[in-house]
Amino acid sequence: MRLLVVAIGRLKNGPERDLAARYRERAVALGKGLGVTACDLTEIPESRARRSADRIAEEAAAILALVPADAAVIACDERGRSDWPSERIADKIGAWRDAGRSTLVLVVGGADGLHETVRGRADHILAFGAATLPHGLVRVLALEQVYRALTILAGHPYHRGDPEA
């Protein structure tokens, strides 16, 4: 399975970019033993359309053009579900991998959010809590959760889980 993060906007040099790169590199290294062939990042330039509706529609077309037909898609959106623990995310990724899905695409929208066509294509819509977060930080959180999910699947001690369980 190939992992692909599709994000609107380009991260400037700084701590968010460094953390995103670190988690992506860790996912690639750990994923090799789990059937993960790559963890790629594609940055789509922010639309320059004047109206918000036009911007998110243009960005949606660019996002969906990168999503393979048989891909599993997780959209990161503030209107998504925030009740999925990391173990459940790992279970879903493992199930998609075991079902032969070629790619897992994580989508991070821009400042205007995600168009309904992207939300409709998603297998799951994930929120990182009720707060609105900068999309650069969401990208880091998405990559950290991918890495954490892989550590759970591998039985790696990075994720210690609930000590009471």
From Swiss-Prot:
Keywords: Cytoplasm, Methyltransferase, rRNA processing, S-adenosyl-L-methionine, Transferase. The keyword Acetylation does not apply. HAMAP family: 23SrRNA_methyltr_H. This is Ribosomal RNA large subunit methyltransferase H. It is found in: Cytoplasm. Pfam families: SPOUT_MTase. Its EC number is 2.1.1.177. CDD domains: RlmH-like (cd18081). Specifically methylates the pseudouridine at position 1915 (m3Psi1915) in 23S rRNA. The keyword Endoplasmic reticulum does not apply. S-adenosyl-L-methionine binds at residue 109. GO terms for cellular component: cytoplasm. It catalyses: pseudouridine(1915) in 23S rRNA + S-adenosyl-L-methionine = N(3)-methylpseudouridine(1915) in 23S rRNA + S-adenosyl-L-homocysteine + H(+). GO terms for molecular function: rRNA (pseudouridine-N3-)-methyltransferase activity. Homodimer. Belongs to the RNA methyltransferase RlmH family.
